[in-house]
């Protein structure tokens, strides 16, 4: 892809992601207003996080990172009929594995909940509800795995719109369930479980027309001995771990949080949702767009363009990610107050969530860079290096959790959940740093001398934004109505963006500096 084509594809994914994230914020506002940050919502967060984790692990994570490079190679060097056969065999194998996995997960639900939220076992009512919610939501895994399979095919063919749009349906379904289905349920929280399953079906359905138009809607056939399937499986096994380190760390944090005071899981979840906005808009969007392009450049043995694409992506990530991290830190309390503080979500919940968001904001830029650096290995069908890096990152997360929790207990700090957020940011920094180390060591990519000027320009622009936000916060009043708080936060964001853009302009930065 040319720079213009990369921008166009990134814009499409970012626009759809923006729609999804905005609806996601509306969803969270509705859910926290209806259910609050209490016991019932904690059980839903845990129950839904597990199938969501496996979705990212098997489907969007390891599977897509292994499948897209192989499919791209087939497209480049083989007949369309062979590509269709590959798709058919992968479809059949994936459907078989996910059906079996879903059934096993339903049978082993109590053990799985005990493993991922052992603290719930101390409250039998909470534990039983979590098991019931898990069994209700786990079919989502199968539907979303097939959705990710369809999305990977479409992305490989340069179609990004419908795959990027599908997450919107999850938010719409959950909002509808919370508003209209909850009153009819004996256990209101289960309305969310049924909504999740319905969303999975809808997300798969919207991919079908585009696959049909491209003559890629192929009936499934199970053949684990097919050459392409064997290669994908070989790449997937190590990638199962390496590509999903973030999700593993989040689940480890959920285990820790289940032993903490009620609300800890919900506070961390709400803060995590805020960090996902910039991560999804830019980090995930660019990672989604560049993997097929990097795979194609690798197949063509064009190392110069390969490096150029990573360099372009890193420039965009730092351009957007650094101010996003700073703004989330500075505006943490106003953002949480404006979006969530109403109904069952009170001032105490706002304060606890804002503390978690401040800690998580430090890791936003690292999480975004991971989305750029990791495809540099996967496009070359190297899944082992991210595994080694992932192991070190998980180890760092575990060590930092113990250190920070121990420190907070020592000083009798009540907001222990902050330790988990800090550990997540620290482990993300380790992950991104090590990925870059190996890219540099193997001469795949390194920051050139032009980055010195860019960092100076970015730094000056961020200082301008910090000054503007600091001044604007003096006028913020959290005691006013929610709509006025929302308007105030929107105004602060606009002021920050304007100050940042002026800072870039004054520093000499121009859009042409992003070309690769």
Model-predicted segments: where are they?
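Membrane-embedded alpha-helical bundles of multi-pass transporters/translocases
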Residues: 1-516
């Amino acid at each position: 892809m040319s720079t213009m084509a990369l921008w166009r594809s990134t814009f499409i994914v970012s626009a759809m992601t923006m729609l999804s994230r905005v609806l996601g914020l509306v969803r969270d506002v509705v859910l926290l207003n209806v259910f609050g940050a209490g016991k019932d919502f904690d059980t839903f967060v845990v129950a839904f996080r597990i199938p969501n984790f496996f979705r990212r692990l098997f489907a969007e994570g390891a599977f897509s990172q292994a499948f897209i490079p192989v499919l791209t190679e087939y497209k480049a060097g083989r007949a369309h009929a062979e590509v269709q056969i590959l798709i058919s065999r992968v479809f059949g194998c994936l459907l078989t594995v996910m059906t079996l996995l879903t059934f096993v997960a339903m049978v082993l639900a109590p053990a799985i909940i005990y493993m991922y939220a052992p603290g719930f076992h101390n409250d039998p009512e909470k534990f039983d509800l979590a098991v019931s919610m898990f069994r209700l939501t786990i079919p989502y895994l199968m539907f979303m795995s097939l959705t990710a399979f369809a999305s990977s095919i479409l992305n490989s063919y340069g179609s990004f719109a419908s795959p990027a749009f599908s997450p919107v349906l999850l938010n719409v379904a959950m909002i509808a369930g919370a508003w209209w289905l909850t009153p009819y349920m004996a256990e209101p929280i289960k309305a969310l479980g049924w909504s999740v399953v319905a969303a999975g079906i809808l997300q798969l359905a919207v991919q079908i027309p585009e696959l049909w138009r491209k003559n890629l809607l192929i009936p499934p056939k199970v053949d684990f001995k097919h050459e392409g399937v064997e290669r994908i499986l070989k790449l997937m096994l190590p990638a199962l771990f390496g590509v999903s380190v973030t999700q593993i760390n989040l689940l480890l944090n959920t285990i820790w949080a289940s032993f903490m005071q009620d609300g800890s899981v919900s506070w961390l979840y709400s803060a995590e949702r805020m960090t996902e906005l910039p991560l999804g808009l830019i980090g995930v969007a660019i990672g989604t767009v560049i993997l097929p392009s990097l795979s194609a450049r690798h197949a063509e043995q064009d190392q110069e363009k390969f490096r150029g694409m990573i360099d372009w992506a890193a420039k965009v990530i730092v351009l957007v990610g650094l101010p996003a991290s700073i703004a989330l830190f500075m505006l943490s309390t106003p953002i949480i107050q404006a979006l969530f503080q109403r109904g069952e979500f009170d001032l105490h919940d706002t304060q606890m969530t804002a503390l978690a968001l401040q800690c998580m904001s430090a890791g936003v830029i690292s999480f975004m860079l991971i989305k750029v650096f990791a495809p540099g290995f996967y496009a070359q069908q190297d899944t082992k290096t991210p595994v080694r890096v992932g192991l070190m990152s998980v180890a760092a997360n575990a060590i930092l959790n113990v250190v920070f929790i121990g420190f907070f207990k020592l000083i009798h700090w009540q907001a222990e959940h902050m330790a988990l957020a800090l550990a997540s940011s620290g482990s993300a920094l380790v992950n991104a740093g090590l990925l870059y180390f190996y890219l540099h060591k193997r001469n795949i990519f390194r920051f050139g001398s032009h980055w010195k000027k860019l960092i100076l320009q970015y730094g000056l622009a961020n200082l301008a934004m910090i000054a503007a936000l600091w001044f604007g916060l003096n006028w913020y009043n959290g005691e006013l109505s929610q709509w006025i708080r929302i308007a105030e936060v929107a105004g602060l964001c606009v002021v920050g963006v304007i100050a940042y853009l002026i800072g870039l302009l004054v520093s000499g930065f121009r859009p042409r500096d992003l070309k690769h």
